[in-house]
């Protein structure tokens, strides 16, 4: 039982990860490193990028992707890859933590179906802005936002990185509960040394 284990095994999922560097990719990378350094074990599932070799202290499962960089700035993953789902399931995570409400959360839900473990979703940014930038036509934009909110609503717990992010999520039609879980920093507390 995950609640009685001293250390958890966590599956982190996101639609961006190095070589793509953005705020969410950095957050996922930091989560994985910190968990792996002593809080438990972690596996990261992300879309494949041509020519990328991963060398981290934790396993990275890359799944098939297609180039959508001109549209959204990164590659879109195919979340139904049997090989990737098998590899992530074999890790036997106690919890799945998705950081993107699109393909990563679809994959998280497929994995939850197999493993019967909870999915936590973190809403990092205002995805409606990205949708409106990538998709023309109000009806298509509204449909995409509704699908995004439905995907988020299917998660067992929803975190937002700020009260403003939570308000944005509500404005999109999300009616469920959420917890404000601010992104952490790894600087020591207290006065900054003069060095």
Regions inferred by a protein language model and the residue ranges of each:
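N-terminal subdomain of nucleotide-sugar transferases
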Residues: 1-62
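Active-site proximal beta-strand in glycosyltransferases
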Residues: 10, 95, 112-130, 159
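Carbohydrate-associated surface elements
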Residues: 48, 164, 184
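Helix N-cap/beta->alpha junction signal
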Residues: 100, 125, 162-163
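Nucleotide-sugar donor phosphate/pyrophosphate-binding loop at the beta->alpha transition
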Residues: 118-120, 128-150, 187, 192
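A short beta-strand/loop micro-motif in the catalytic core of glycosyltransferases
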Residues: 153-162, 179
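An amphipathic, basic-hydrophobic alpha-helix
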Residues: 69-98, 103-110, 114, 142, ...
């Amino acid at each position: 039982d995950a609640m009685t284990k001293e250390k958890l095994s966590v599956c982190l999922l996101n639609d961006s990860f190095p070589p793509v560097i953005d705020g969410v990719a950095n957050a996922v990378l930091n989560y994985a490193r910190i968990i792996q350094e002593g809080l438990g074990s972690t596996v990261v599932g992300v879309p494949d990028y041509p020519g990328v070799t991963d060398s981290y202290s934790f396993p990275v499962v890359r799944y098939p992707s297609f180039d959508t960089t001109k549209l959204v700035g990164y590659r879109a993953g195919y979340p139904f890859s049997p090989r990737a789902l098998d590899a992530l399931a074999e890790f036997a995570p106690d919890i799945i933590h998705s950081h993107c409400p699109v393909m990563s959360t679809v994959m998280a839900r497929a994995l939850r179906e197999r493993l019967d473990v909870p999915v936590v979703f973190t809403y990092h940014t205002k995805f409606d802005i990205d949708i409106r930038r990538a998709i023309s036509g109000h009806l298509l934009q509204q449909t995409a936002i509704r699908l995004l909110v439905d995907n988020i609503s299917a998660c067992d717990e929803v975190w937002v990185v700020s009260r403003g992010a939570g308000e944005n999520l509500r404005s999109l039609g999300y009616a469920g509960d959420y917890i404000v879980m601010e992104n952490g920093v790894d600087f020591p507390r207290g006065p900054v040394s003069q060095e």
